[in-house]
Amino acid sequence: MRALALDVGLKRIGVALCIDKKIALPLDAVLRKNRNQAANEIKNLLKIHEISLLIVGIPKGGSSEEEMTRRIKHFVSLLEFDKEICFVDESGTSKEALGYGVANTRKKDGKLDSLSAFIMIKDYFAL
């Protein structure tokens, strides 16, 4: 069983992979130029890695929770993923990811986003 976790943002999408509920690792983030380009890149990952479970972070709390949840669910619908999708609370994952010692948080390369996705998948499977 393979799972993919997504930390969907407006500029970047953090991505992490879990294999057989034992091994989890962050992948390169997808830099969003537009929705369709980003959706196509994620679709490709879903296919290449033969994903059977998609874990998607939803921000809980905060003033923009409702709007971000709507945007994230719309993006997920563009993936046309016909297997299991699980939405999880991503609150605090970025802060926790900083504890992993990302070398340069000013550099917007998506490493922090993919570490957030890694934390979501790690928590989901209690790794």
UniProtKB/Swiss-Prot annotation:
It is found in: Cytoplasm. One of its GO terms (biological process) is rRNA 5'-end processing. It comes from the Bacteria. The keyword Transport does not apply. Its EC number is 3.1.-.-. Keywords: Cytoplasm, Hydrolase, Nuclease, Ribosome biogenesis. InterPro entries: RNaseH-like_sf, YqgF, YqgF/RNaseH-like_dom, YqgF/RNaseH-like_dom_sf. GO terms for molecular function: nuclease activity. Pfam families: RuvX. The keyword Hydrolase applies. GO terms for cellular component: cytosol. It is an enzyme of class 3 (hydrolase). Could be a nuclease involved in processing of the 5'-end of pre-16S rRNA. PANTHER family: POLYNUCLEOTIDYL TRANSFERASE, RIBONUCLEASE H-LIKE SUPERFAMILY PROTEIN (PTHR33317:SF4). Belongs to the YqgF nuclease family. NCBIfam families: PRK00109.2-2 (NF001026), RNAse_H_YqgF (TIGR00250). This is Putative pre-16S rRNA nuclease.
